[in-house]
Regions:
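ABC-type nucleotide-binding domain
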Residues: 2-244
Length: 244
């Protein structure tokens, strides 16, 4: 089982390959303290999402050790592991039904107040009150909502899960700037009490991280705070300036 209380994560010399002769992660060692905002950046294909797959028990065939709260994740049942972490991607699934039904997937006994509180945090409550409130109906995959609204609703649902660890895998890609800014504000606030593991190709979103891992070809090329990495004038600084 995963221990109770604040959890830290440690990876030691983690290697992973989808195919025998093509290693994706080449000896990754990282430590994530509890209640920290950790970001992973780098060109696509550098191993960021593969790493998220290992942490969520999707990618099992790795070598090396991955521990949560000092317990190796290979000794933890997947459903037990996932009760301690919530993963939000850029296309989080919403199903046809009411907003209330979608939110209660995360917490079946959530009260009206709890649901309205998380909707307020993601700035959707006023919009929904102009519709049918919690009874507002979503079409299949939420297609009657904008991309930014769908993502904010997925985030509201994630907040109801209330797990110690949150993994955001490109959760702010392909949405409007206003929604992106709102989501980043929620994530920054969340990082005060939760561990945030944040994967992003947009470096402006990772500036406030406690630690940034710049990955390249399956290894950690650079690590540190934004200020530290900018002073290094290496790959991170080059990519950051290129994106300005």
């Amino acid at each position: 089982k995963v221990p109770q209380g604040e959890l830290e994560i440690s990876l030691d010399d983690v290697h992973f390959a989808y195919e025998k002769d093509r290693e994706i992660l080449k000896g990754i060692t990282m430590n994530f303290p509890a209640n920290s905002f950790i970001s992973f950046v780098g060109e696509s294909g550098c191993g960021k999402s593969t790493l998220a797959g290992i942490l969520t028990a999707r990618n099992r065939g790795y070598t090396g050790s991955v521990k949560i709260g000092g317990v190796d994740i290979s000794d933890i049942m997947e459903n037990e592991l996932m009760s301690h972490m919530t993963k939000i991607t850029h296309n989080s699934y919403l199903f046809a039904g009411t907003v209330k039904e979608n939110l209660r997937m995360a917490k079946p006994d959530a009260s009206k107040e709890e649901m309205e509180e998380v909707l307020e945090k993601v700035n959707l409550l006023a919009f929904l009150k102009e519709q049918d409130g919690l009874q507002t109906v979503l079409s299949e995959r939420g297609e009657n909502f904008s991309g930014g609204q769908r993502q904010r609703l997925a985030l509201a649902r994630a907040l109801l899960f209330d797990t110690p660890i949150y993994i955001f895998d490109e959760a702010t890609s392909n949405i409007d700037m206003e929604s992106e800014e709102m989501i980043m504000n929620v994530i920054r606030e969340l990082s005060k009490t939760k561990m945030i593991l944040f994967i992003s190709h947009r470096l402006s979103n990772v500036v406030d991280s406690d630690c940034i891992y710049m990955m390249k070809d399956g290894i950690v090329a650079e690590e540190g705070t934004h200020e530290h990495l900018m002073r290094k004038k290496g790959a991170y600084q080059h990519l950051f300036d290129k994106q300005k």
